[in-house]
């Protein structure tokens, strides 16, 4: 009986729809009477949202095209210093603080949010090295950096030959996680897509000799375990990635657990750990475990802490 009633209701709605479609005046009167008074405003809002999304999508595409063009070609990027300057006091020492704006690229699929990726920097002699979250390397001389307007010079790398999964270049939660320069060698930590495993990742390190024309990275350290997107709580933001110089022979790396919490407690993998890694052999030793997402890492050589 219930099934027959449902069929009858559907037939009635179909007949009404046919009648309305065949009588334009009646259709307009029907919608004018029954539609909400502010439906026009709502429609305009929806149209504006889609228009904004279209503009942002085009902007994102243009930025991505530009990124693809300059990552393999030397180019100068402008830096602008802000007018505001101030003195800050830290541990009884005064520091001169000045803000600079640097052009980087959209690295998020959430176009409406206009999320920008992170960037990392370290010093090499009299130059400041900078890398964006999506792998764009550049440098500037410190004396030039102090000027009102200056330029970053991009450096070509082989990053795109090593890191081929799309999220590295398009989503801020993936990508480069830190930069460390020791003597003439440069290290970057990043979220690595594990070969042979679909949508599975861990925190790893690339290493290269500094070269102002082209930096040729090689794989230096790869974690022994990974977490896949299929895991219910997977989150690439919880990846750690801080690198610091430890001693003459080793560096320290923090790794996250990608919210697979049990792996941080397991000493048979490298997730959710502080790891000591030999600079030459890349052999490692776990020195601390049970971490979710270590973002601050500092080693005090004076008291070995």
Language model region names:
Residues 1-16, 22-23:
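N-terminal Sec-pathway targeting helices
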Residues 15-52:
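Membrane-interface motif at the C-terminal end of an N-terminal transmembrane signal
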Residues 248, 279-280:
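Short loop segments at secondary-structure junctions
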Residues 2-9, 38, 58, 202, ...:
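Asparagine-rich low-complexity intrinsically disordered tracts
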